[in-house]
Structure formats: C-alpha cells, structure tokens
Amino acid sequence: MNLVRGKPASSVVQRALAVLDAVARGGESVSLAAIAADLGLPKPTAYRLLRELAEAGLVRRATEGSGGFTPGPRLESLALAVMQHAGSSTARHAILSRLVDELGETCNITVLDGSQVLYLDRVESPWPLRVHLQPGSRVPLTCTASGKLFLARLPKLRRDRLLAQMRFERHTDRTLADRASLEQELERIRKNGFAVDNEEYLAGLLCVAVPVSDSRGKTIAAVAVQAPVARLPHERARSTLPALERAARALAATYDTGLTRASRSRASASRGTR
C-alpha cells in the first residue's frame, strides 16, 4: 500500500511506524498537529498516514470531538500478541515463579484486553486450597484487582468510554455495583499505586495488584498475588507490595528491548523527513 505518493516504500513504512508510535505513546489522545510537529511531517502527509491507518483499524479518532487520535482495536490486538510472544514469556514466567516462591501464594500477569482482564501467565502455589484460572482466562474489570488497576490508570477519555459500556454485575456482597462507588475506588488506587480485590469477585479470595509500567509510566501489564483471606487477610495486603513491586520492575525490563527498538525507529523516521 503506497501511503505517500512519490516516496520509497521503505520511507513510507518508517513514517507509518513513527505515526503509530506517536499515537500509542501520546496519552489520552494525540492531535494531527502534534503528530506532524513531533515527527517533522507536513500536515497533509501526516493526515494521509492517519487516514490509511484508521482504515486499517490501527488508529481511531478520539471521542467527544477532541479531533485527536488513539490506538485502534487492531493495534491493541497486535500489542497483545507481541506480549504473548514465547521469547519474552519464558523470562516473565521465571520472574513469576520466583515471586510465588517468595510470597508462597499464586501469582499472575494480566493485561487489559478490550473491556476485560486477560491472564497472560500464572503460577500456582503448592497449597491445596486455591483458585484455578488458566492463562487465557478472562475476568471482569470492575471487581478484580488488576481490572480496577487498569481502569484507574487509563486516560480519562478511554476510561469513561469503557465505563459507559459496563454492566455493573454483583458477584459477591462486596462487589462495587455502581459507577459512583467504583470511581471513588479508582481515585484511591491512583493515589496508592496498587489495587486490592477484597472478596469482590469471589467470596473468600483476596488479590493485590501493582502496575508494570514502561519508561514513560504507561501501564502495560499488571502483576498480582491472590490467596484465600484465611491466609492473606485484608490487613496484610500491603505486606505483599515490596515483592510485587520488585517483580513489576523485573517484568518491565523484559519489554525494554522492544521499546528501545520502537524509539529508534521513530527517531530514524523523524530524521529522514527533516
């Protein structure tokens, strides 16, 4: 597909990747003007690239008339596939196994997948009393520790769009079953930097989650521990944070190579257009 007339295909690919990188890393939404200025592209060129990328589902226009652009569903799907790549998942599984050894409870790595939480990896504890959720399982956003963490750390426009589509189902008598209560909880999570599911999804189960963030502070995954409240009562939830945060930093490092390559690609494309 020739996105820009009169330019070599390799140059077009580099520019398209640079635009995708700018949108993916731009926070809530990125305007055409900001993308053009950031990459040193003429506005008509940037617009043609964005239009073609939008037609491919890689970007989409932000809501509420902002005129900006956000990652599209196809780009989100590709990102998820990369995160599941076997080459990096081996290192992440080893980190997760060490975390289970340290805490003595089941731990998992999750990502945001549309309007649900997807289990990327999971290592079970040796305890006979535990909950079995295999990698590939999906759970709700509004009543799980990882889900609430993702919601709390999303840009406001995207969070509002997701919450507007949510059905607030009550799973236990502790589930936050209305948006106002959930919004208060999300504010606490943003302030504290971690999330707790205190029997909100499954009675008798407590879960603590912390973010795995890239170099810009964007949440790319979550790492969590879960255990029966008989072994991990709510008042002991904070005791798991040092180990969880060490694991989160180690997990973030497994993404560094890919993020560095993307940044170099973006810088190269930008230099080539000036």
Tell me what each language-model feature is.
Residues 1-90, 249-257, 272:
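N-terminal helix-turn-helix
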Residues 257-274:
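Short, highly charged C-terminal tails/helix-capping segments
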Residues 15, 92-95, 240-247:
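Hydrophobic alpha-helical membrane-association signature
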Residues 171-172, 203:
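Intrinsically disordered, low-complexity polar/acidic regions
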Residues 65-66, 70-166:
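Amphipathic alpha-helical effector-binding/dimerization core
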Residues 177-248:
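Extended hydrophobic
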